């Protein structure tokens, strides 16, 4: 018996070594590469790249090789450096032919990030639905949590750990009335008081139909969002940006990236393909353009999108990154 245990132990160790050796080799031979900070400038019509050299000196240049000072970059990226330009009294009256103020810029600026580790992390299946039309200025966390079951939605009072039957029936009936099929297969919300307003959740039902769910004055608000013919959504993201222009984002089964407008209409973006389970996505948005950084396990791709119709303005590829698979 002891001999068998030793043999089993050594076999297990050997299997683990074979499994881990490729990763260990990749990790030990990894050469760290810092991706330069890259932003699209609608003022310049090109990407502005900021990078440290071997002597730790900053270089600022565009894709054509033209170099710039920090003060010039401030003016080329007024949405990013709005505070600096305002402090220096250099903020322009117009940008790209449009009259703007620092307040306009700050209202429409936003950042968004999606990483595979968050997408692939185990989900508890418990959510918090805030009151979206509170009489108070500040948002407040609810006293209950909810979950989706095969038959409906259940609200659980956290103090007593008991199901609120009346509220559960109220919300379940409304969801069924709007055509929702239980159970839900994906839900995205942002239950925090550190935001300007609450839009509840974007939810995919058992048939991958898209719904908007929130609580307004204690009652359910449910809206079925119409999808283009043949589109099967797989991931949704609630946004809740200050401008209130968008409700969220959606990625379909073919990895197409859609913008969900505040009225529920969908616009397909020019991004060529994004798999949230494998790729990292970062968006720096303003009222003129979006700088979208799509990172795979090896490469970085930058896309400049028009902030009006999300069409492609310019793209840039950085094929040089070496990192362990996330």
Regions found by a protein language model. Name each.
Residues 316-325:
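Residue-level detector of conserved catalytic or cofactor/ligand-binding positions
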Residues 6-25:
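Hydrophobic membrane-insertion alpha-helices, especially the h-region
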Residues 167, 255, 259-264:
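C-terminal luminal/periplasmic domains and tails of membrane-associated envelope-modifying transferases
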Residues 45-113, 132-156, 192-205, 211-212, ...:
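Short beta-strand elements that form the blades of beta-propeller/WD-repeat-like
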Residues 164-175, 221-229, 267-274, 315:
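Beta-propeller fold detector
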Residues 124-136, 180-191, 230-240, 272-289:
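Repeated scaffold domains used in trafficking and secretory/extracellular systems
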Residues 24-48:
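Alpha-helical transmembrane signal-anchor/signal-peptide segments
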Residues 216-217, 263:
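Short loop/turn segments that connect beta-strands within beta-propeller blades
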